[in-house]
Amino acid sequence: MPLRFDQLDHKEFQDCTSVGMTEHEVIELAQAFRLYGFWSINLDTGLFLATPDVYRIFDMQSEDGRMNLVEFREHIHPDDLPILMECFERCSSQKQSYHMIYRVKRGADWKFVRTVGKFREKPGTSGEIVGITYEFFERLRTAAFTDGDD
């Protein structure tokens, strides 16, 4: 399967309030027709927190919002896992944003999901990576990074 690296130019922030929408409405629309979850990884402790849709995407049981990284990795296609781990590494070490489209186990088949993440400063710590993951229906693995200048 082909892999494409994208160069991202900084996008202008799209303010939903400029068209009369609230942030809640934006999230409601994003989640309306697909699984769409939020997550964070504390870089000092490794604590990986996720919302229920992330658990549903990975066909995992949600107990207290703490994602089991070992189980999480078992659900990712073995060809895609090293690239996803590189995304996490580059994001945290170079304070970048990234996106990646990759395959997740669904029964005997694989489905595509997209993860978008970014490094976030957290005072007194090494920071954290925060992001979203949602079902994706294109059939191309891809990864992209920004230069970190916000």
Where does each model-flagged region fall?
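PAS-family sensory domains
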Residues: 2-16, 55-147
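Acidic active-site catalytic centers that drive phospho-/nucleotidyl reactions
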Residues: 42, 80, 135
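Short, charged helix-to-loop "capping" segments that act as catalytic/coupling loops
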Residues: 42, 107-109, 139
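Short, positively charged
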Residues: 12-22, 81-83
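PAS-family sensory domain signal
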Residues: 18-73, 112, 118, 144-150
